[in-house]
């Protein structure tokens, strides 16, 4: 059986990478900080596909949400889209760059599967994201105590996410976290913890990749 290989950008705690490895996949992890088991430490904008030692079967991308978040986008953007801070300009450049890398991998491997993940916010409004199919998942539907509605763009038609939840749902056990509260995602200290992805979601995504890979062989 062919080994399935993937890349994980903005990896942080490697939620996706760990799930993939538990299913026997090979993973190349990228982050700008030297967290544990990061293979490439550096600015994604300075990368090219030759920095990855193989042509991947899949890629997961979790770019910085700071300038796209509902809470802070007015600090960084005009009309929620046009960048007005240097960091917003930088984030747009980085995201366009890794999307260009996705396009290169698709040329080399037409079966390349990608996922782009960001908390529900203004990234969905950006012009460079409009060509991708978007789903919205809620972390509480994957065993997390946070609701955290999250957008995921992908070309994998075999992945069917779980039904969405809603704020104040009496039938869900997620923490109630009005804006500014100390519960839910807002109560997690540091971006490292806030960015962790539920293992049930990671495994579901990776299993859909295995299914797609087997179907295409």
Regions found by a protein language model. Name each.
Residues 1-217:
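Conserved active-site and SAM-binding loop architecture
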């Amino acid at each position: 059986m062919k080994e399935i290989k993937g890349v994980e950008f903005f990896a942080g705690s490697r939620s996706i990478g760990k799930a993939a490895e538990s299913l026997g996949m090979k993973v190349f992890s990228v982050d700008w900080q030297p967290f544990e088991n990061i293979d490439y430490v550096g600015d994604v904008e300075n990368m090219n596909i030759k920095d990855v030692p193989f042509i991947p079967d899949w890629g997961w991308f979790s770019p910085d949400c700071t300038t796209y978040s509902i809470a802070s986008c007015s600090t960084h953007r005009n009309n929620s889209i046009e960048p007005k801070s240097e960091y917003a300009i930088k984030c747009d450049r980085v995201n366009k760059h890794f999307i260009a890398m996705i396009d290169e991998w698709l040329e080399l491997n037409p079966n390349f599967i990608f996922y782009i993940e960001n908390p529900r916010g203004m990234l969905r409004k950006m012009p460079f994201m409009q060509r991708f199919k978007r789903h919205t998942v809620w972390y509480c539907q994957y065993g997390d105590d946070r609701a955290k509605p999250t957008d995921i763009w992908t070309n994998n038609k075999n992945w069917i996410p779980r039904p969405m939840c809603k704020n104040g749902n009496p039938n869900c056990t997620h923490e109630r976290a009005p804006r500014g509260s100390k519960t839910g995602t807002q109560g997690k200290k540091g971006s490292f913890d806030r960015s962790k992805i539920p293992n049930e979601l990671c495994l579901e995504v990776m299993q859909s990749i295995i299914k797609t890979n087997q179907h295409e062989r």
